[in-house]
UniProtKB/Swiss-Prot annotation:
Enzyme class: isomerase
Cited InterPro entries: D-ribose_pyranase (IPR023064), RbsD-like_sf (IPR023750), RbsD_FucU (IPR007721)
Alphabetical keyword list: Carbohydrate metabolism, Cytoplasm, Isomerase
Pfam families listed in its UniProt record: RbsD_FucU
Domain of life: Bacteria
Name of this protein: D-ribose pyranase
Signal sequence annotation: none
Cell compartments where the protein resides: Cytoplasm
Record's keyword annotation contains Isomerase: yes
EC number: 5.4.99.62
Molecular-function annotations in GO: D-ribose pyranase activity; intramolecular lyase activity; monosaccharide binding
């Protein structure tokens, strides 16, 4: 059995397959996901697993260069945004590099999410609880 944080075989494989600048979307239960896009659907029921708990585990195994958020999270879900930014700042310290943070309107976020290598769907049911993590390199 694996000793690292990600036990889900499909999610572990997706993370391992990411190359430099590849995108990985972690999203709430409502974000549209194209049928042809690779999706790791972790959603069990409303709120399980949560967006933040899923993000926390993924960040233990992924070197992140930049992230993308929907601008609307600032007004519609400031608590999630604040906790997410705290996690990203902590990760930047651990990685020894700044992580670029970009905001776009939600319609553009959805278009960019469609270009991500994969999407991880959570059971989160709060507005705009979505992020695209762009893979970096640790060297």
């Amino acid at each position: 059995m694996k000793k690292t944080a990600v036990l889900n075989a499909q999610l572990s494989g997706v993370i391992a397959s990411l190359g430099h600048t590849d995108g990985l979307t972690i999203c709430d239960a409502g974000l549209p996901i194209p049928s042809e896009q690779q999706c790791v659907d972790l959603a069990l029921t409303k709120g399980v697993p949560s967006f933040l708990s899923t993000l926390e585990v993924v960040l233990t195994e992924l070197f992140v260069e930049r992230i993308l958020l929907a601008e609307e999270i600032k007004q519609a879900n400031p608590t999630i945004e604040q906790q997410l930014l705290e996690m990203i700042n902590k990760l930047a310290q651990t990685q020894g590099r700044q992580i670029e943070i970009e905001y776009v309107v939600h319609s553009e976020f959805k278009q960019r999410s469609n270009q991500a290598k994969a999407v991880v769907r959570t059971g989160e049911c709060s507005p705009y609880a979505n992020v695209i993590l762009y893979s970096g390199v640790p060297f």
